[in-house]
Swiss-Prot record:
Domain Globin: 2-146
Transmembrane annotation, as ranges: none
Name of this chain's protein: Hemoglobin subunit gamma
GO biological process, one term: hydrogen peroxide catabolic process
CDD domains: Hb-beta-like
Annotated SUPFAM superfamilies: Globin-like
Gene: HBG
Residue numbers binding heme b: 63, 92
Organism whose genome encodes this protein: Macaca nemestrina
Keyword Acetylation carried by entry: no
Superkingdom to which the source organism belongs: Eukaryota
Amino acid sequence: GHFTEEDKATITSLWGKVNVEDAGGETLGRLLVVYPWTQRFFDSFGNLSSASAIMGNPKVKAHGKKVLTSLGDAIKNLDDLKGTFAQLSELHCDKLHVDPENFRLLGNVLVTVLAIRFGKEFTPEVQASWQKMVAGVASALSSRYH
């Protein structure tokens, strides 16, 4: 999708208030709890036996932080998401064989986490811009499959 100046402003201003470490851990943690089949990509992460184990797992938190950090890079390059994610796409698709559907799920979980954290500030308009953003990221990450 094409990002309007308004989309960019909306995404950037909310992103400035996001605690990448906290929100990253929560987003990846929720992904693994809500969509348990995604856990198979994280065999090396140790204890994922329950929701509380997952949410407290330091490796989940660390990778979640990494995920949102790369999302922050993307936010600086909304007009070239494909270029921004070329290497990550190669890694996740060619080497790890992650189903692209999982990128979409992660994006939806992130939107949920932002909604919880920002409450009323996360208006329908803000949600629309973010949904466009996570869809763009998912499709950029999946580009190796086409």
